[in-house]
């Protein structure tokens, strides 16, 4: 009961208005009335005023304000690169379109019209889906803050995606690529070899320090990633909790890493840079390396050959293709790549596995 009789004969109203977003404590009021009838009327009046005030606040929230609320929470709860990505998508594709919109009047129709607008600009289905996801998250914030009762993006289907043919290098192609790199470019030989033989993500590789190499167990301790944001080198946790893992390496790869470490120490001595176990493995100057130089060099080293260049991330695909060719199972590959589930591994790489039907048919041939 929200109304109870006190010992002095009066009636107390106990009305709750939810929880304080800062302290987490319940927001409540307990006024007193002379009679039960007055108490019930007071309770109804307080609840009505609360609903009217909440509705007034909802109507006063503009779309730019809603964006600010979403980005503020995103900056606190997300990794820096994700926050920057959301900020970019919203500023480039969303904010101007809904600038003067009354968020209380945005319906499913307005959302699908916006999606149609995006498609007409020539964006790929994947890009449109990403933008729509960001828009939906903005409205999720409105629902969470009780500005809206429901998300107008609900039940808007994602556009179908056409799976592009995955590009990767086979071992003989990778060997040819490595042979194209001059002998004095040991940094690049080492970087691309580590990428091909471990399948690490680029951010994970650039965040590696010498202390992350276990020479006894022949393992790399992968527990961080990195990126450059607004000119600052930012180290973060890996993509998912499953990305924190230990990746086994072969002896030849360890020897290559040790050769590069010696060369790096000599380079640092010449430049007057301190070298230690905290030094980033693929660093070659007084600041950690950026991804773009390793991306550009792939095309540069391939330019005078008939070898088709691949993207930096395709080294990860190449590693998986190598493991599948060697007969490794999904579970092993999932753990090595740091995927959150086997389903992810199958969805991304399942088509690379050999067709078992052909193998079965060949066995039946042998019976006749």
UniProtKB/Swiss-Prot annotation:
GO terms for biological process: chromosome segregation; DNA recombination; establishment of integrated proviral latency; symbiont entry into host cell; viral genome integration into host DNA. It comes from the Bacteria. Putative integrase that is involved in the insertion of the integrative and conjugative element ICEBs1. Required for the excision of ICEBs1 from the donor cell genome and subsequent integration in the recipient cell genome. Appears not to be transferred through the mating pore. Integration of ICEBs1 involves an attachment site in the chromosome, attB, and a site in the circular form of ICEBs1, attICEBs1. Residues 61-143 form the Core-binding (CB) domain. GO terms for molecular function: DNA binding; site-specific recombinase activity. Belongs to the 'phage' integrase family. Keywords: DNA integration, DNA recombination, DNA-binding, Viral genome integration, Virus entry into host cell. The active site is at residues 201, 239, 313, 316, 339, 349. The keyword DNA-binding applies. It comes from Bacillus subtilis (strain 168). SUPFAM superfamilies: DNA breaking-rejoining enzymes. Residues 164-362 form the Tyr recombinase domain. This is ICEBs1 integrase. The gene is int. It holds the Pfam family Phage_int_SAM_3.
């Amino acid at each position: 009961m929200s109304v109870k009789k006190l010992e002095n004969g009066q009636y107390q109203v106990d009305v709750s208005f939810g929880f304080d977003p800062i302290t987490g404590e319940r927001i409540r009021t307990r006024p007193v009335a002379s009679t039960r009838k007055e108490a019930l009327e007071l309770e109804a009046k307080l609840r009505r005023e609360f609903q009217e005030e909440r509705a007034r606040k909802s109507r006063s929230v503009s779309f730019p304000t809603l964006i600010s609320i979403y980005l503020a929470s995103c900056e606190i709860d997300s990794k820096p690169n994700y926050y920057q990505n959301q900020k970019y998508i919203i500023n480039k594709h969303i904010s101007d379109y809904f600038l003067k919109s009354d968020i209380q009047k945005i319906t499913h129709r307005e959302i699908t019209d916006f999606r149609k607008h995006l498609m007409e600009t020539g964006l790929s289905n994947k890009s449109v889906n990403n933008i729509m996801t960001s828009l939906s998250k903005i409205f999720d914030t409105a629902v969470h803050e009780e500005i809206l009762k429901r998300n107008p993006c609900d039940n808007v289907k994602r556009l179908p995606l056409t799976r592009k043919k995955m590009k990767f290098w086979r071992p003989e192609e990778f060997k040819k690529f490595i042979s194209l790199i001059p002998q004095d470019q040991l940094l690049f030989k080492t970087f691309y070899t580590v990428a091909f033989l471990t399948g690490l993500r680029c951010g994970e590789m650039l965040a590696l320090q010498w202390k992350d190499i276990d020479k006894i167990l022949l393992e790399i301790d992968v527990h961080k990633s990195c990126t450059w944001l607004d000119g600052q080198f930012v180290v973060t946790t890996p993509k998912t909790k499953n990305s924190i893992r230990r990746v086994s390496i072969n002896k030849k790869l360890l020897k290559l890493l040790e050769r590069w470490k010696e060369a790096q120490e000599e380079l640092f001595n010449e430049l007057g840079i301190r070298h230690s176990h905290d030094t980033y493995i693929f660093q070659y100057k007084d600041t950690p390396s950026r991804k773009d130089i390793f991306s550009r060099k792939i095309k540069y080293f391939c330019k005078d050959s008939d070898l088709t260049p691949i993207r930096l991330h395709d080294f990860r695909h190449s590693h998986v293709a190598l493991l599948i060719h060697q007969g490794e199972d999904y579970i092993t590959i999932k753990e090595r790549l740091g995927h959150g589930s086997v389903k992810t591994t199958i969805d991304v790489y399942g088509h690379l596995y050999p067709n078992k039907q052909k193998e079965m048919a060949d066995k039946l041939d042998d019976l006749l």
